[in-house]
Amino acid sequence: MNTFGRLLRLTSFGESHGPALGGVLDGFPAGFAIDEAAIEEALRRRQGGRSDLTTPRRESDKVHFLSGLYEGRTLGTPIAFVIDNADTRSQDYSQLSDLYRPGHTDFTYQAKYGHRDPRGGGRASARETVVRVVAGALCDQWLRAEGVHISAYLSQVGAVHYDDSHLYEAIHLTEGDKVLLQSRYEQIVPCPDKATAERIAAAVAETRDSRDSIGGVISCRVDGLPAGLGEPLYDKLSSRLASAMMGINAARGFEIGDGFALASEYGSSANDPFVPTEAGAIEQQTNRCGGLLGGISMGAPLTFRTAFKPTSSIGREQMTCRTDGTLTSLSITGRHDPCVALRAVPIVEAMTALTLMDFYLLHRAYSTAERG
């Protein structure tokens, strides 16, 4: 499917080396004032060619809105937009039309459709995520107006780990940690800790120079969510969020809160105790559940991690097959990211925003219906 969401639906179209990519965001409420500069900033964060740690492909990523906006405000009608492709070098892929690239969708797309576009991965290219970032930036603005703040950051690349427990596990952030989170985009490596960012940069550079690629983990924290978002059983916020993250190119793992670590613990240590606040409310003392119980938000920070595999396109020689079954070897040329996780941080934020705004609108629709 090329459409994501229920009440708020994003449909994307286009290929990596086609003339353009685009999207239609349907269900966005009318009358909301759009900040186009914020959209441009989100796109800049995703953009390649800004350093030698990312792909040299540099697109302008200028958004052309075709419908759904008038005088800077949403109309409540479908918001359609396109982003032109200009910096394509399709000749780099001419030798791949009869090969199956290891780790790519060549084999599966051929098996499903009987025809595929090998240029940059076609529809399966991470270039498609530029559409998600535009739509996600619109949703992020709407959520911020509701007091919801999404902060994703790089917490691991290869063997380099950032100890982010003070950001990921805290119920309430200190003012210093809030500033730290806001600083994550001030360097090329979007990690709040500058020392760790430098170590990550060195690891990526070493990998690039060896014509290889490396994986990473992106952590995300959402503050300001009210209790009650999500549906029981088959439409949990956790399951929808997992679908959103695993739908990102190269995503290979997902966990809410402490996730897989809880599998080796006892309930006595895994449970988050409830405690009264000074204001007379109730909150958790810890947040190992990641802010969700039964797939429904409880007013605590929503925390999750997404793991990304190493980029499939590498310069090292790999064994593969031609489409006729002949064994051969392959060294991929062209322009590729040595670590996709570096540019995936704003994509994680975008998909989070799309998911959460959809749940907000559903929650309000149900509440209105119940009031009659």
Regions found by a protein language model. Give the residues of each.
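A short glycine/serine-rich beta->alpha loop
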Residues: 9-14, 117-128, 227-231, 287-292, ...
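Glycine-rich, mobile lid/loop segments that gate access to catalytic sites or pores
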Residues: 112-230
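Short acidic, glycine/tyrosine-flanked loop/strand segments centered on an H-E-D-like triad
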Residues: 97-122, 319-336
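Glycine-rich anion/phosphate-binding loop at the beta-strand->alpha-helix junction
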Residues: 13-19, 133, 210-327
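Glycine-rich, N-terminal phosphate-binding loop and its surrounding beta-alpha-beta segment
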Residues: 42-102, 106
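Alpha-helical support elements that line or immediately flank enzyme active sites
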Residues: 19-31, 126-152, 235-243, 300-302, ...
